[in-house]
Amino acid sequence: MILLEGVKKSFGNKQILAGVDLNINAGSSLVIIGRSGTGKSVLIKCILALEKYDEGKILINGVENRNKNNKTFYDQFGMLFQGGALFDSIPIWENISFRLLQSNQKISRSDAKQIASEKLKLVGLNTDIMDLHPSELSGGMQKRVALARAIAGDPKIIFFDEPTTGLDPIMANVINRLIRKIVVEMGVTAITITHDINSTRIIADDVAMLDSGKIQWTGKINQLDKSENQMVDQFINGLTEGPISNNY
């Protein structure tokens, strides 16, 4: 379980997080929605201890994450970056198993390649691409390779940062459904940040809306369309009139 209580974060005089309270149940898939620039990525970085928050508390399975920047702490996480973030200079299988090869587990290259093969199959790719380089793959295939890398270490918690950015609608749906499949089959806790409502409907068990530095609404995915929250209604329907300012 991940618990956030009164988390605040500012950069200079600009407050990004103004007291975030959030409870993320173990094994659930939470999607954090909100317009661009509302602090979704900053919030994820605070959970990962990549940014130090100014006030509040973040507990991961009952342990506060402040100053937890050691390898053991990060081993519990997987991450699918917005741009994929694959290494162009190494083959696909090494991209997938990169973290395993850098770990203290002393895994052999042959074992790492076998794990990469298994993860490729999970994301619907053939293993005959393992010795290719990222530049030889399509954007959708690269995204699936990045997803395979995110699950290579069998993490307990996976973060998805705008997972369908830059993809056409068909491939976006492929990625959304793969994420949902992996979350269910692996039983992981998933946290996704997006402004894509279609992605939200496929991936989420629970939804939280972040705006003005705070969580404005939380609920189950089947409550999203009947939230009776003006901000949520404006956002999911793309309305120009409402409590959310369009001056951003």
Predicted regions, residues:
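Conserved ABC ATPase "signature" region
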Residues: 109-128
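ABC ATPase NBD coupling module
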Residues: 65-78, 224-227
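Short coil-to-helix segment of the ABC ATPase nucleotide-binding domain corresponding to the Q-loop/switch region
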Residues: 90-98
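Helix-to-loop junction immediately C-terminal to a conserved catalytic motif
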Residues: 48
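Conserved ABC ATPase signature
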Residues: 133-137, 141
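Catalytic Walker B motif of ABC-type/P-loop ATPase nucleotide-binding domains
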Residues: 158-161
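Conserved catalytic motifs of ABC-family nucleotide-binding domains
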Residues: 154
